[in-house]
């Protein structure tokens, strides 16, 4: 009764937002009801967070009637609920799951609890042990949940859609092709310039003739490895009085076949289809393409008729005669050029003075020449040595001796 009187005498606080002010002062915050007869106080909130999140009640002198609190999810249990749960007997355990017999099919129902969830597809060893007639029970040990494999919605691809890759033709499959040009690539051919310098002799003999003023022509070539059509620019550069033939726009071809310094390109001629074919050859490739000589190409276009034997200087040389017959043979201790020089006769060199060129005539006809005014004196003073041939007393007015 004393608690009831204190509740009625306590004034209402209109500005307090919490329902905790409706409780009598001095209550223990344990969630228990007050010990008194006829107490009609509302129950205390479960926690401090619930007191702040609870809906505000209208302030009045009499205790309000609160609506029932809806279940908004799992809340932490109160001390009274924990004590009641501890005093109540535990629920009976669920019945054990019977093991599957070995003869049951895979379509039988499986347990839905997490302790019995297994992988959908068993391994071959597990299926072998379960299918054996030893009657061993399946282990009830819980396993981790595994991801299901989507096998029903995915259909296997038909065998016709998996077409095999086309066989790559060999780089030496040159049936019906004639080799007309082969070039070993240098640093300038595989650089970023994108052009390959061709040998002049083969380019002028087998490739198309450049008749335009700018000296350019588009040249299409089929790739020997993958039958791709390449379009190059065939041109020449004036080099003094000669020409230098170049194949431009070759950068993509070099990068496609990964050509490096020392590799080679081979150009073929397909006479049947009247086209050009280009192939790449690595440096380690032992099989080399045979390039025909220009004389053989000319002989096929213009056949050479046999020459009649004529007994004059125009008759051809006998085949058994070798050019070594005209070269003098050297001794074992001397070179061939030393033998040729030693076989030449010695040519005597005359002792001629420089002043003799200005005195070709006698003294009477050279009176106007002041350089030879003292010719008689210079002639009498000149004394030559027999061994050296030089003058012992040279004339200062005369020129140098030869």
Swiss-Prot record:
Residue ranges, compositional bias (Pro residues): 88-102
SMART domains assigned to the protein according to its UniProt record, in alphabetical order: B3 (SM01019)
Family matches, as CDD domains: B3_DNA
DNA-binding positions: 181-284
InterPro entries linked to this entry: B3_DNA-bd, DNA-bd_pseudobarrel_sf, LEC2-like
Signal peptide range in chain numbering: none
GO molecular-function term, one example from the UniProt record: transcription cis-regulatory region binding
Keyword Cell wall biogenesis/degradation in record: no
Region (Disordered): 1-174, 381-402
GO CC field: nucleus
Keyword Disulfide bond part of the UniProt annotation: no
Compositional bias of kind Low complexity: 74-87, 103-139, 156-169
Location relative to the cell: Nucleus
Tissue specificity as recorded in UniProt: Expressed in anthers, pollen grains and young developing embryos.
GO BP terms in the entry: flower development; photoperiodism, flowering; regulation of DNA-templated transcription
Keywords: DNA-binding, Flowering, Nucleus, Repressor, Transcription, Transcription regulation
UniProt cross-references to PANTHER family, sorted A to Z: B3 DOMAIN-CONTAINING TRANSCRIPTION FACTOR ABI3 (PTHR31140), B3 DOMAIN-CONTAINING TRANSCRIPTION FACTOR FUS3 (PTHR31140:SF73)
Note from the entry: Plants overexpressing LFL1 show a late-flowering phenotype.
Role this protein plays: Transcription repressor involved in flowering time regulation. Represses the flowering activator EHD1 by binding specifically to the DNA sequence 5'-CATGCATG-3 of its promoter.
Protein name in the entry: B3 domain-containing protein LFL1
Species, as recorded: Oryza sativa subsp. japonica
Lineage: Eukaryota, Viridiplantae, Streptophyta, Embryophyta, Tracheophyta
């Amino acid at each position: 009764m004393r608690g009831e009187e204190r509740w009625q005498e306590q004034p209402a606080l209109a500005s307090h937002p919490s329902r905790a002010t409706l409780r009598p002062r001095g209550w223990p915050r344990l969630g228990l009801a007050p010990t008194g007869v006829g107490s009609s106080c509302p129950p205390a909130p479960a926690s401090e967070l619930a007191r702040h999140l609870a809906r505000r009640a209208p302030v009045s002198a009499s205790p309000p009637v609160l609506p029932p609190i809806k279940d908004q999810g799992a809340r932490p249990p109160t001390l009274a609920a924990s004590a009641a749960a501890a005093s109540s007997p535990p629920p009976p355990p669920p019945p054990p799951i019977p093991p599957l017999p070995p003869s049951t099919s895979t379509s039988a129902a499986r347990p839905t609890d997490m302790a019995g969830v297994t992988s959908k597809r068993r391994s071959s060893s597990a299926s072998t042990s379960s299918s054996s007639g030893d009657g061993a029970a399946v282990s009830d040990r819980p396993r981790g949940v595994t991801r299901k494999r989507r096998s029903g919605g995915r259909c296997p691809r038909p065998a016709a859609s998996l077409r095999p890759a086309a066989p790559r033709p060999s780089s030496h499959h040159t049936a019906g092709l004639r080799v007309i040009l082969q070039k070993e690539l240098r640093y300038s051919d595989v650089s970023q310039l994108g052009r390959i310098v061709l040998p002049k002799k083969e380019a002028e003999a087998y490739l198309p003739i450049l008749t335009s003023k700018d000296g350019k022509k588009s040249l299409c070539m089929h790739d020997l490895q993958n039958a791709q059509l390449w379009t190059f620019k065939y041109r020449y550069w004036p080099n003094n009085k000669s020409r230098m033939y170049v194949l431009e726009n070759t950068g993509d071809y070099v990068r496609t076949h990964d050509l490096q310094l020392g590799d080679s390109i081979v150009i073929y001629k397909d006479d049947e289809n009247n086209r050009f074919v280009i192939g790449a050859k690595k440096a380690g490739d032992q099989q080399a393409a045979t390039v025909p000589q220009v004389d053989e190409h000319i002989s096929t276009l213009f056949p050479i008729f046999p020459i009649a034997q004529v007994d004059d200087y125009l008759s051809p040389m006998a085949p058994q005669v070798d050019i070594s017959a005209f070269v003098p043979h050297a001794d074992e201790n001397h070179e061939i050029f030393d033998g040729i020089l030693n076989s030449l006769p010695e040519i005597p060199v005359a002792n001629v003075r420089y002043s003799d060129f200005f005195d070709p005539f006698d003294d009477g006809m050279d009176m106007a020449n002041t350089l030879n005014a003292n010719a008689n004196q210079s002639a009498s003073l000149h004394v030559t040595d027999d061994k050296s041939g030089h003058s012992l007393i040279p004339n200062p007015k005369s020129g140098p001796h030869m």
